[in-house]
Every structure is written in C-alpha cells, then in structure tokens.
Amino acid sequence: MSDFVLELDAIERTYVTEAGELPVLRGASLSLAPGEIVGLVGPSGSGKSSLLHAAGLLERPDAGEVRVRGQATRDLDDRARTAIRRRDIGFVYQFHHLLPEFDALENIVLPQLIAGVPSARARQRAEELLTRLGLAERLLHQPSQLSGGEQQRVAIARALANAPHVLLADEPTGNLDPDTSDTVFAAFRDTVRAEGAAALVATHNHELAGRMDRILTFADGHLTPYVPA
C-alpha cells in the first residue's frame, strides 16, 4: 500500500481548440499524504481545474499516471474508474449545486443512500457532519433558507458524506465575502482533518492558500512548490 492517497505522475493534457492545440498540463506531478491539505495556486485558465479533473478521474490525461491509494488508474475501464471515484474521492465546487427541494440533512443523506448505506446510519452521519460544520440548528432548512456560507458548508458535508480518502476542492470559497470565506475554510480544514482525509484545494487566493499545509503553483503547465520570499 502506498504512503500517499493520491499521486499524479507526469500528467499531460492538451485541448484542441479552433486556434489549434492548447497544452494545459505539461508533466504535472504531485503526491498527497493522508491528513494533508495542499493549496493549488494559479490564475484563471492556468490549468487548475484540468488537474483536478484528472486527479478526480473525471477526465483521462493524454499521458501520465494517476494513482489513488496506490491503485494505478490509467489502464482501467470507465466502470472501474467510476467505482474508485465514488469510493475514494469527494468534490467541492465554487457553486454548491445543492438539491433545492431537499433540506440540508436530506442533501447529505441522499448520496449515502445511493452508496447503499442504511437510512438510519446515513441520517446519523449527516447529523454528525452538519453539526461539526456548525449547522446543528439548520438541519431541516432548505438551501434557499440558508446563507451562502451555510450552503457551502452543506456542500462540504455532502462531499464528505461517504468518507472519501481524498477531497478535491475547486475555488470552494471563491463566491463568498472575505469574512464568510474565512469561516467556511476554517470549518472545511478542521472537518477534513477530523475525518482523516486529505485535500487538494485549487484557488487563486494566495492568502487562503497560506493557511494550508503547503502550496503548489502553476506555471506553463508545470507544478512547482511555493517558496515564500
């Protein structure tokens, strides 16, 4: 078994546009250890989302290998890749996409039921996560009755519902004001660590990234460790 929950080895990705080929990932590599929260920093269009899509097995890279808990995925068929993604990976996006007709608790219960978790256990897990994220008094509120920060915390709980080993977050606080962003990220960080998971967080916010365990920056499709001046 690998010491890392996620490994990307020399990932290459090029998109074909009307203007020609557009390389966005040029040999990008990283390793993510259990309990580690890593910031992925770069401007819009630098390739952060493409890297997360490759890491989350949503897209196949043109070259390179993605290993999840030591399992190589390059040569697996789509069904096997989907099984790994559902079992081991959770996603948090800038826009939460909560189901509007369900309350906060139901939004966390539903993905567990889909995964085959018994209803009572799924409800208990949902209550525990939402309480840990400071939403104990908002369990039965629908998304429209929650603030933006509360909605994003529900989205974090949903991503953690099935106890993934890896959490991939794409600008998880990007649409929030600074104070709310700080509150949501603190809840995110504390909950991820309490769960024993690891997280890769894409952001253009250097201040937010500075609160993570380490930072990787994008430049010309390559990942490099950030070294403070």
Curated annotation (Swiss-Prot):
It is an enzyme of class 7 (translocase). The complex is composed of two ATP-binding proteins (LolD) and two transmembrane proteins (LolC and LolE). This is Lipoprotein-releasing system ATP-binding protein LolD. SUPFAM superfamilies: P-loop containing nucleoside triphosphate hydrolases (SSF52540). Keywords: ATP-binding, Cell inner membrane, Cell membrane, Membrane, Nucleotide-binding, Translocase, Transport. The gene is lolD. GO terms for biological process: lipoprotein localization to outer membrane; protein localization to outer membrane. It comes from the Bacteria. It is found in: Cell inner membrane. Residues 6-229 form the ABC transporter domain. Pfam families: ABC_tran. Gene3D superfamilies: P-loop containing nucleotide triphosphate hydrolases (3.40.50.300). Coiled coil: none annotated. GO terms for molecular function: ATP binding; ATP hydrolysis activity; transmembrane transporter activity.
